[in-house]
Amino acid sequence: MAHKKAGGSSRNGRDSESKRLGVKKFGGEAVLAGNIIVRQRGTKWHPGANVGLGKDHTIFATVNGSVSFRTKANGRTYVSVNPIAEAAE
């Protein structure tokens, strides 16, 4: 017979804050230079053309354009930005 009540609730009840990872701009979406495209832990997505990779593996646009995702033969998914043609004035 138990001599103490179930005391588990006081020791549990904790959780970490969500990190809001994932794709922020999807394929075909317009981005400005500096916009974050993907937040990730490690390189689930790899940087392609016209994007940069931050120290926390964040992929961001380096030029204005539209986002594209492409899976190559090596099985890796690459994120690129296709630049928009600037109108000549």
UniProtKB/Swiss-Prot annotation:
Coiled coil stretches, renumbered: none
One Pfam assignment: Ribosomal_L27
Regions that span the bilayer: none
A biological process from GO: translation
Keywords: Ribonucleoprotein, Ribosomal protein
Source taxon at top rank: Bacteria
SUPFAM superfamilies cross-referenced by the UniProt entry: Ribosomal L27 protein-like
Signal peptide segment: none
One Gene Ontology MF term: structural constituent of ribosome
UniProt-annotated stretches for the region Disordered: 1-22
Example of a GO cellular component annotation carried by this entry: cytosolic large ribosomal subunit
Ribonucleoprotein among keywords: yes
Family the entry assigns: Belongs to the bacterial ribosomal protein bL27 family.
PANTHER family on file: LARGE RIBOSOMAL SUBUNIT PROTEIN BL27M (PTHR15893:SF0), RIBOSOMAL PROTEIN L27 (PTHR15893)
Name this polypeptide is given: Large ribosomal subunit protein bL27
